[in-house]
């Protein structure tokens, strides 16, 4: 790194620089954020600034995200719209995560795979994945607390299913259509939360082909998945074009 790049890097790591970026973000997104529904809006603004490493920044984010549990829903997904995640360098946007990787592997599987590469990148990946494990523990605790407040059997059953799906993310691969869609929603939310935009869904037919799709409720399950994807559409919208979320599903 030459002297100029070294100085620029140091400046970008300062609170002053990142605060200016945060102010510019909220200014440019004010119209979109004003269109959030009441349950999508955050009651407070907080931020996670880049300091030492990206893995540390992500882990701080995982610890600060406000978890929103919605009773009566088949799936649970949320974005903490009041939590700003600082990116001091350009992001790769308009991309589709490798959902097959997270459906066919648990987080512990991914940690073990990453451990096969003895380099700084694999070390950072392992730190971040362990942070996700801690985040899932928080989610499970929130779901369990929500269950204790309920009396409706159907709502309790739905949340118990969701709790099981989150627990299985830690050490098991997906085994059903519903579980796979919940896992896709969760991992997609991590990209949105960290300021990525135009997060695609990809070849959903190929990704889901391994699961039993001819069950009577499969149409309803997929419909509920679409409804969850539509949540936070104002937050997800790119630029000034409302609805341009990039959540494109490719078939065939």
Which stretches of residues belong to each language-model region?
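N-terminal leader/propeptide and maturation segments of large enzyme subunits in energy/redox metabolism
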Residues: 89-157
């Amino acid at each position: 790194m030459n002297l100029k790049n070294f100085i620029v890097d140091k400046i970008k790591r300062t609170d002053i620089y990142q605060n200016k970026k945060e102010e510019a973000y909220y200014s440019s997104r004010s119209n979109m954020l004003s269109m959030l529904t009441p349950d999508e809006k955050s009651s407070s603004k907080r931020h996670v600034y880049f300091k030492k490493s990206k893995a540390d920044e992500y882990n701080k984010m995982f610890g600060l995200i406000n978890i929103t549990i919605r009773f009566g829903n088949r799936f649970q997904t949320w974005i903490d719209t009041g939590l700003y995640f600082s990116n001091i360098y350009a992001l790769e946007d308009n991309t589709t995560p490798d959902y097959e990787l997270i459906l066919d592997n648990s987080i512990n599987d991914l940690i073990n795979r990453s451990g096969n590469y003895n380099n700084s990148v694999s070390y950072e990946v392992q730190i971040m994945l362990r942070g996700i494990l801690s985040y899932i523990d928080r989610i499970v605790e929130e779901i369990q607390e929500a269950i204790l407040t309920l009396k409706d059997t159907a709502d309790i059953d739905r949340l118990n299913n969701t709790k099981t799906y989150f627990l299985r993310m830690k050490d098991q691969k997906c085994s059903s259509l519903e579980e796979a869609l919940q896992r896709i929603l969760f991992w997609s939310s991590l990209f949105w939360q960290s300021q990525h935009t135009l997060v695609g869904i990809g070849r959903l037919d190929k990704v889901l082909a391994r699961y039993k799709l001819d069950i009577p409720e499969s149409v309803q399950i997929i419909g509920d998945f679409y409804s969850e994807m539509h949540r936070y559409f104002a937050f997800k919208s790119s630029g000034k074009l409302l609805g341009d979320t990039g959540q494109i599903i490719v078939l065939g």
